Amino acid sequence: MSGCPFLGNNFGYTFKKLPVEGSEEDKSQTGVNRASKGGLIYGNYLHLEKVLNAQELQSETKGNKIHDEHLFIITHQAYELWFKQILWELDSVREIFQNGHVRDERNMLKVVSRMHRVSVILKLLVQQFSILETMTALDFNDFREYLSPASGFQSLQFRLLENKIGVLQNMRVPYNRRHYRDNFKGEENELLLKSEQEKTLLELVEAWLERTPGLEPHGFNFWGKLEKNITRGLEEEFIRIQAKEESEEKEEQVAEFQKQKEVLLSLFDEKRHEHLLSKGERRLSYRALQGALMIYFYREEPRFQVPFQLLTSLMDIDSLMTKWRYNHVCMVHRMLGSKAGTGGSSGYHYLRSTVSDRYKVFVDLFNLSTYLIPRHWIPKMNPTIHKFLYTAEYCDSSYFSSDESD
């Protein structure tokens, strides 16, 4: 018999028929439609009827419907929803710090994860400007006249966010020569005043850094040992440079050394730190700065790994807030040029003045890189201290309940 020997069932194999899409055997259709039995459904849970009908075009109410006003409203509403989520995360983190739950180091992971979430949201908000920029200046001008006197400066949630993170009130740029709170009335003004009186994230982080293990003068005494090591290291560096033959290169190295010496030794001048603090050029207390630098230097130690992640997240948030302000400035400049804003401000010129270190909260963390030193200058740990930094601290033998930790 000629032909393919594999045809038929010559080898005694049993071939199973594969299920055909749409047949009774299609597993993709074996679920149960529970919504058909009543109860909470998607639209009701999210209150979509309210959310999706909250776009009232002012141009349309004035009888001149402008297409791009819808995009303008949607984008700003999305911003406000994300601001609400950021405030939700920020308030929860502040509560953990305020209630002392952060003393149980197991809660630090929760703090870090929530602050990281805030930074991821801010990344999205920075990118969101690109959607608004699909609208041209002429498109915006078509409906801009209908917006006055509404202004982005009147965003209550953004001002609350600034206050709760820790933007210093005396560092704010006046808005038309008036206090920023003068633009808010009634309950909104009271909420802002209350947020100014509450503990900020900056203050809570500062108190936490002041408790950094290893700062104790009668313990590891990190600061005392660091000063001693830096002083000795600078002396050795100066001797090395002086041993070189006279040359232009040597003169440059001596000049560079003197600058480095001045910067590093300024670390141990507490009066200078207090002076810079009073001017607003530094934000953290002297002891908190010591704690931050210790975490920075020993970030690879198990006990400092999560705290270092928190410091990194705080810097990310500060950077992203600055990027958000900068992108906002660029967009306003593109849309308005140098015209006044709809709320009466100087527009681009006012916004440009807010893109500076005046509005940075954790500027001291960025400046830690100023004090980088060779690794062999960092104080070595004895076995006892090294073991200590392998041990986390906790308040009791069990995790907090959801009521306490949420």
Curated annotation (Swiss-Prot):
InterPro entries: Trp/Indoleamine_2_3_dOase-like, Trp_2_3_dOase. Heme binds at H328. The keyword Transcription regulation does not apply. Changing H76A: Abolishes enzyme activity. Keywords: Dioxygenase, Disease variant, Heme, Iron, Metal-binding, Oxidoreductase, Tryptophan catabolism. Pfam families: Trp_dioxygenase. One of its GO terms (cellular component) is cytosol. Pathway: Amino-acid degradation; L-tryptophan degradation via kynurenine pathway; L-kynurenine from L-tryptophan: step 1/2. It catalyses: L-tryptophan + O2 = N-formyl-L-kynurenine. SUPFAM superfamilies: Indolic compounds 2,3-dioxygenase-like. Changing Y175G: Reduces enzyme activity. GO terms for biological process: L-tryptophan catabolic process to acetyl-CoA; L-tryptophan catabolic process to kynurenine; protein homotetramerization; response to nitroglycerin. One of its GO terms (molecular function) is oxygen binding. Binds 1 heme group per subunit. HAMAP family: T23O. Belongs to the tryptophan 2,3-dioxygenase family. This is Tryptophan 2,3-dioxygenase. It comes from Homo sapiens.
